[in-house]
Amino acid sequence: MKEVSVVLNGFRRPFSLEKQYNAVKARTVPAKEIFMWKNHPENETQFDFSKYTDLAISSNNANYGVWARFAFALNTTSEYICVLDDDTIPSEKWFENCIHCIENENNGLYGTIGVIFNDLDYRSYIRHGWANPNEETKEVDIVGHSWFFHRDLLGAFWRESTVPVSHLCGEDMHFSYDIQKYLDLKTYGPPHPKDDKSLWGSDPELANRFGVDKDAISVNHHSSIFGTSLKHYHSKGFKLLNI
């Protein structure tokens, strides 16, 4: 059986940890190991880690944003890696779905929400995945909420290590840009068939609830920082499907 290492991200949603932990343990391809990168919020949120004896935790005294977990992922030992946002609860065949796509369709970067941009301001775009189910694998510009990939792609993430435009966003664009530039690989949303949610990358009810709560970056930060990051990578040569 293929092996998958999971990297969770903790900040202000301790209530989602148990759901995530139980979900990744119960996949048709169960997680071989589970890591957690915990950022330190301004107002300390209590996480109870006592019941998670096999969870490898890096608990920090600062908020390193969304980028550091991809450095932490270098500690994993599996062939495949899945990095999950803390608002994302994968369905039971999510890992299996991604592995099938990589091994039988196209190697590349996969995720549960795929985005195709219509402008560089990050205001007009098309989403695919749990928010807009796609029956077949869909090529996209970037993916978010989860990133599933062969560990060989992780090296490409760090080929360019310039200071990010923002520590709160841009890691998704950076990853897709780097694999496109250095590995000639693309980014995809695997199938999210309407009649089989076991393949989906996120529980849509929970994703909608967590993704718009008070701790959601997309809700609490103006889209201009996302647009600035997108323009940055486009200026460096990031090829977008509709632009």
Regions found by a protein language model. Give the residues of each.
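Cell-envelope/extracellular polymer assembly enzymes that use nucleotide-activated donors
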Residues: 3-7, 33, 174
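C-terminal catalytic/acceptor-binding lobe
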Residues: 15-20, 156-243
